Design a protein with these regions (language model features):
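Outer-membrane beta-barrel pore domains
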Residues: 2, 6, 37-38, 190-191, ...
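N-terminal periplasmic/intermembrane-space "pro-region" immediately following the signal or transit peptide
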Residues: 2-7, 21-188, 569
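Residues that define the transmembrane beta-barrel architecture of outer-membrane proteins
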Residues: 143, 196-200, 249-254, 287-291, ...
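Residues on the lipid-exposed face of transmembrane beta-strands in outer-membrane beta-barrel proteins
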Residues: 149, 202-208, 256-260, 293-297, ...
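Transmembrane beta-strands of outer-membrane beta-barrel pores
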Residues: 153-159, 220-226, 274-276, 299, ...
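Surface-exposed loop and membrane-interface regions of Gram-negative outer-membrane beta-barrel proteins
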Residues: 155-201, 206-264, 277-285, 403, ...
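Repeated loop/turn-to-beta-strand initiation elements of outer-membrane beta-barrel proteins
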Residues: 212-216, 264-268, 302-309, 341-349, ...
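Surface-exposed coil loops of outer-membrane beta-barrel proteins
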Residues: 227-343, 348, 352, 357-407, ...
Length: 569
């Protein structure tokens, strides 16, 4: 007569649970039929994998794991020795009787065993745990650390119009004004020949929950320190545009921040962190991160409506006595989010004011230069961060013999930005997302430019920019066969926004451009997808500003094709 005693894993002392389990698994294959043997092998593989993971993560040492396995082996041998001899059938073969365990019960046992082992390792240590308080602390710290990242491989073809204005014409007869300082300074600059390049972008982020209210973050990325908008690394390139010959890449700190959440919905951030404002790449480039201090607040208004607001102060440069004044950005944004309908439809709208302080160019004088020791120009808009498009004027003194050329911004910048996004959930997983963005520079004006530049009458340029975009498909590419396509049009006036922070891809970067964008994404595996984007741009105004009613037209058209392979983890 056989007696079956039911015993669940939870009824065993935690200090003996794994040892007895492994012992049973070691003895099991010798007592089981084919199907039961397969199930036991699966369970044994699960437990052994769990033990190896605990060793790898420092929760228990390899010596402890080996000792556990030896104890389990001895227990298995003891169990087999104590077992009664099996019955023998008429054919002389041993008869094995195995009680039936339903699949649902076996699955529950596996899950419960895993939970019990993990629970025991999260304890405070002591006799009932492994590794004591130090290992428990490691396990706890690991549970509060989040690691994420992505890698993008890009092939890019840039086709510049054969009828584009040559670089030499950008500076002929125009000494004091420009909208393309890099081309103005180099009469041999390329404005007509096509460019092909391959690029890689890699980002690795760490986010640690210090407490429930405090988060610290750090992100490393490829890319240089000479521009804020891009984290791309061009292959086969060395320093100062020399050939790379397998030269290694440099990593930069792209984010380093501490975020506080003292109240529900309120987030205070300091350091270098992700863009806290709703917007598009018409104003802020996709890869741009902010540095400074910001506060964001989200508040539900009712079951469908919620409000949000963000504000921040961001230093651009600090005051250097006798050399330069402080420059900064002060920003505020407020908006609403409406969830409507029986499907997950949403309408999100926001209005923002981005006000720059101290960035306008100041015309230098002979007196300035003669009274200040080791004098340098104080309001230059430098080549390390500017792109193209903003109206610039020569800020150097007009004194005889001063042949240097340094450029300053002819306009101030106080940008009023209105952004809206309508997300319509259609049949199945498909969404139609319509996006609009309109921005105007409240500090732009020909009279202001004339006073600032010392009498230069600029009669062209624009303070207005807008973007419209429609996207159809899955909102996010996460699984294989996910896809979306989009089409957009933009027109960004020369001085609608500061050209340093807008898109670095459209029209080769900067402002004073208009045109179309077509794009598509397709998932090939989980968190792995292909992207294609085509951009076609032309100028809005001449790159040589119209001075005193004398126009100097320029042409600069660019078609850009980008093909990407993306992997996210």
């Amino acid at each position: 007569m056989e007696t079956t005693v039911k015993r669940t894993p939870s009824s065993l002392p935690k200090t003996r649970l794994v040892v007895l389990l492994i012992a049973a698994l070691m003895a099991g294959p010798q007592l089981a039929q084919a199907q039961e043997r397969e199930d036991l092998e699966k369970l044994r593989a699960t437990v052994l994998s769990l033990i190896n993971t605990l060793v790898k993560n420092g929760v228990m040492s390899r010596n402890q794991a080996d000792a556990m396995m030896r104890d389990a082996q001895r227990a298995a041998e003891t169990k087999l020795a104590a077992a009664p001899p099996p019955d023998v059938g008429a054919d002389g073969k041993k008869i094995v009787r195995v009680p039936y365990v339903p699949e649902a019960v076996r699955t529950q046992m596996r899950e419960q065993i895993t939970a019990e082992v993990l629970a025991s390792t999260r304890g405070a240590g002591g006799a009932g745990g492994w590794g004591g308080t130090e290992s428990a602390g490691v396990a706890e710290a690991g549970s509060r650390l989040k690691i994420s990242g992505d890698i993008r491989l890009r092939g890019e073809a840039i086709q510049q119009g054969s009828g584009n204005t040559p670089a030499l014409a950008y500076s002929e007869g125009q000494r004091d004004l420009t909208r393309a300082a890099d081309v103005w300074a180099d009469p041999n600059a390329n404005t007509r020949e096509d460019l092909d390049r391959t690029r890689v972008r890699a980002r690795l982020g760490f986010q640690f929950a210090v407490t429930e209210q405090v988060t610290a973050g750090l992100t490393l990325s490829t890319g240089g320190v000479t521009g804020p908008t891009s984290t791309n690394q061009t292959m086969a390139s060395g320093s100062n545009q020399t050939p790379g010959y397998f030269n290694k890449y440099a990593l930069t700190v792209d984010k380093a921040f501490v975020a506080l959440e003292p109240l529900r919905g309120l987030r205070l951030s300091g350091g270098r962190f992700a863009n806290p404002f709703m917007g598009t790449d018409l104003v802020w480039a996709d890869d741009l991160n902010f540095e400074g201090f910001a506060a964001s607040y989200k508040m539900p208004l009712d079951s469908q409506w919620s409000g949000f607001a963000s504000a921040g102060w961001f230093p651009l440069s600090f005051k250097a006595p006798g050399q330069s004044s402080q420059r900064s950005l002060t920003a505020i944004q407020g908006g609403v989010d409406w969830q409507f309908g029986t499907r997950p439809n949403a309408l999100k709208m926001a209005v923002a004011l981005y006000d720059y302080s101290g960035i306008e160019g100041i015309k230098e004088t002979t007196l300035d230069k003669s009274l200040v020791r080791d004098y340098v120009v104080r309001s230059e808009y430098g080549s390390g961060y500017r792109q193209r498009g903003n109206t610039l004027f020569r800020i150097n003194s007009d004194m005889a013999g001063d042949t240097a050329t340094n450029w300053g911004l002819a306009s101030g910048f106080s940008e009023l930005d209105l952004t809206a996004a309508l997300d319509l959930a259609l049949d199945g997983p498909f969404h139609l997302v319509l996006t609009g963005d309109v921005v105007t520079n409240l500090d732009f004006g020909s009279s202001k430019i004339k006073r600032r530049t010392g009498g230069l009458s600029v009669s062209d340029g624009s303070d207005l920019g807008y973007l419209v975009k429609a996207q159809f498909g899955m909102p996010v590419i996460a699984q294989a066969s996910d896809w979306n396509v989009s089409v957009g049009y933009r027109r960004l006036g020369s001085d609608a926004v500061l050209d340093a922070f807008t898109s670095s891809d459209f029209g080769r970067g900067g402002t004073n451009n208009k045109g179309f964008t077509l794009a598509g994404n397709y998932g090939i595996w989980k968190n792995t997808w292909l992207s294609a984007r085509w951009m076609s741009s032309d100028l809005v105004d001449s790159m040589v500003p119209t001075l005193g009613g004398v126009a100097r037209p320029t042409k600069f058209s660019v078609d850009t094709l980008q093909l990407d392979l993306n992997a996210r983890f």
